[in-house]
Regions:
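Short, structured segments at the rim of ligand-binding sites
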Residues: 2-429
Length: 429
């Protein structure tokens, strides 16, 4: 079965954040959205039913289920475990209304192509954060033997049988690496991916594919080897890794409010670059096993330079949240966005709250102010929306965030989590 909201139009929502609230307490980090999405696509090449533990209940995840279900998959949540059985799947044409809204729908191309010999989808959507071409995905699939053409806004892929190849990526794209991995797992022979992405989510997908009975080596390095074959496991259970961006956002929420937080079910190694910048801002961070504790000063120090980079560099998905943090820190901070060319839309909204900065091209120079002032702002994308929430927590008065439904694409009830830590956030439909 698919989730109830499939087919419903998006509802515009606002949230109201009361300012000057310290974030203090203990929270659990949910499963990683960016690990779950490609793994959901990979269930199409499983031999039997799959149980995904720690699977976040997010809009993007539910949209992926609303693509899988019409193709014939059976999907059902039991708590935070998602049960999927794709053995009865027969279709290879993705629902256009959903695939055009969801960038991760592109992950379905590789699995559908290898299973059915064809795949059809629209050009994918997602957050408006710059030009995110899918050419690396398509080039990789063509290197494996796929025939691909564009027709009336559709991507149409066909292949009798994919064959392993050596693929050199022009850029270490996470999505392209994942798509090629899934397609290559079912291809004839070995595929080697050079300049592969190294993100933890790549490692999680590789682990899942290995659990299905395929063989992927080198995940976490820049060279991946995928040995084509067939799935051998009749049933697979996999636990999704913790979401490093959720962890970073919650730590930033405590930091911007001068609070203290303990995070459980977090992987400290995955948030190393984020923790390093929070320490530079004056936070104390301790880690023990799968837990981390952050305590923040009353006012943060400047951060001399944040440059977004592919993993293990600083993640672009934390740039907006750190922009909000720097807006109220002492001194002058600099942020350089190297991954996307249009990811400063949140800056203009923060300016409405009193943030002081100059921006040119991919660089923002932020002069911290002592206080922001609550007002009406807009969430233009998922992470920008999270940044508005953090700014609202630290501001004087109330901050109303419009289009807040975008936040639900990557955070599982963020307002409830923060309210449990001392925030006062309410929803307004």
């Amino acid at each position: 079965m698919c989730l109830a909201f499939c087919g419903k139009e998006k509802q515009m929502a606002s949230i109201v954040v009361s300012g000057r609230r310290r974030i203090c307490g203990e929270a659990r980090v949910t499963g990683a959205k960016n690990a779950a999405l490609p793994i959901l696509a990979a269930t199409l090449i499983a031999r039997g039913p799959v149980e995904l533990e720690n699977c976040p209940r997010l809009k993007d995840v539910e949209n992926m289920l609303c693509i899988l279900s019409p193709l014939g998959a059976q999907c059902e949540y039991c708590g935070d475990t998602l049960k999927i059985d794709t053995r009865s799947a027969t279709g290879s044409v993705m629902p256009q209304s959903i695939s055009k809204e969801l960038r991760s729908s592109i992950f379905m191309l590789g699995p559908l192509l290898t299973r059915f010999g064809s795949a059809v989808c629209t050009f994918p959507g997602g957050c408006e954060i710059g030009h995110r071409p899918i050419d690396l995905h398509l080039k990789g699939l063509m290197m494996l033997g796929a025939e691909i053409r564009e027709e009336r806004g559709l991507i149409i892929c066909r292949a009798d049988r994919l064959k392993g190849a050596e693929i050199h990526l022009d850029y270490p794209s996470v999505g392209a690496t994942e798509n090629i991995m899934m397609a290559a797992a079912c291809a004839d022979g070995m595929t080697r991916i050079f300049n592969a992405a190294r993100e933890p989510e790549i490692e999680d997908l590789a682990l899942f594919l290995n659990e299905l009975g395929y063989l992927v080596e080198g995940a976490g390095s820049s060279t991946l080897s995928v040995y084509g074959g067939e799935a051998r496991r009749e049933k697979t259970t996999h636990r999704i890794i913790p979401d490093r961006i959720v962890a970073g956002t919650l730590m930033a929420a405590a930091a911007i409010t001068g609070g203290e937080i303990r995070l459980n079910d977090v992987c400290p190694a995955h948030v190393g670059s984020i923790a390093a910048k929070l320490k530079e801002a004056g936070c104390k961070i301790e880690q023990q096993g799968m837990s981390m504790r952050l305590s923040a000063p009353d006012r943060l120090n400047e951060i001399r330079l944040i440059e977004t980079m592919p993993y293990p560099g600083f993640p672009t998905d934390m740039q907006a949240q750190m922009f909000a943090l720097c807006a109220v820190a002492k001194g002058t901070s600099v942020i350089v966005e190297n991954v996307f060319e249009n990811r400063f839309r949140h800056a203009a909204e923060l300016a409405r709250m009193g943030a002081s900065f100059t921006q040119k091209d991919r660089t923002a120079i932020i002069r911290g102010v002592e206080r922001l002032t609550g007002t009406k702002v807009t969430a233009w994308d998922l992470r920008g929306g999270a940044a508005m929430v953090l700014a609202g927590l630290a501001a004087d008065g109330e901050t109303t965030i419009e289009h807040a439904e975008l936040i639900d694409r990557g955070y599982e009830k963020l307002h409830e989590t923060l309210n449990g830590l001392g925030a006062e956030i309410r929803l307004e439909e």
